[in-house]
Amino acid sequence: MTTQQETLTDGNALKQFVVLAKSSKGRAIVSIIEKALNHPSVFVFGELLDMPNVQQLKETEFKNYYDLLLIFAYGSFIDYKNKKDSLPQLTPQMITKLKQLTIVFLSSTSNVIPYSVLQEQIEITNVRELEDLIIDSIYQNIIKGKLDQKNKHLEIDFSIGRDVQPEQLDSMINCLNNWSSTSQKLLDDISGLITHSDKVHLQYRKEKEEFESKFEIAKLNTKNDSPAEQLYYDSMEYSDEVRMKKGPKIKGKDYNKRP
């Protein structure tokens, strides 16, 4: 028989917690929150946090578990430390996860994070322990980046997304609107360059066709010209053919000539 724990796989862990929260209340909700915070693959909690039965914890004796879930969704390790006395005690798994989420939080402000900042924010004094935590986070695909041990900083290339607080939505919308405006301007500039390039190409073709037409007319007219004039036009055509065969010369060098 499949147990509840076995069904909480990497792909559906959060979804399963959300489903369980729909029909649970009080202490049962607390148990679901604890399991979600301890689960090695769950790093976003907004959907669980928004569940009505979870929201109801704010009015009960279990409010501290709601506050704890709030920190894991939006906060950092320092936030927990500042409210530690009024919050449930963290398990070792929760401590590690919250420290990893703190690294993700810091990566949203800078893609180069000094060791000193990391050590202060997640309260790790030992550099080797800090690097082990970072390496574990990279292996878990929480972040992507590299350690610069010489300069003692972490270079971030990628980090997972975290939950967004409602009050952050307006700021995000403004950022997206600015990005959209910049992208549209860039697209308009590129379209303008393409249009200009097409015009130049068409003008070149037109001039080339006009020249070839005039040249053919001139050749036909040579039939009625004197022998000297006909020799002149023939020599012009011959010179063009020779130049085409020989190719370009730069600084007196013939690049079609074999060594």
UniProtKB/Swiss-Prot annotation:
It is found in: Cytoplasm; Nucleus. Its main location: cytoplasm. Keywords: Cytoplasm, Nucleus, Signalosome. Component of the COP9 signalosome complex (CSN), a complex involved in various cellular and developmental processes. The CSN complex is an essential regulator of the ubiquitin (Ubl) conjugation pathway by mediating the deneddylation of the cullin subunits of E3 ligase complexes, leading to modify the Ubl ligase activity. Belongs to the CSN7/EIF3M family. CSN7 subfamily. Component of the CSN complex. The holocomplex is comprised of 8 subunits csn1-8. In the complex, it probably interacts directly with csn2, csn5, csn6 and csn8. InterPro entries: COPS7/eIF3m, PCI_dom. PANTHER family: COP9 SIGNALOSOME COMPLEX SUBUNIT 7, COP9 SIGNALOSOME COMPLEX SUBUNIT 7/DENDRITIC CELL PROTEIN GA17. This is COP9 signalosome complex subunit 7. Residues 1-161 form the PCI domain. One of its GO terms (cellular component) is cytoplasm. It comes from Dictyostelium discoideum (Social amoeba). The lineage of its organism: Eukaryota, Amoebozoa, Evosea, Eumycetozoa, Dictyostelia.
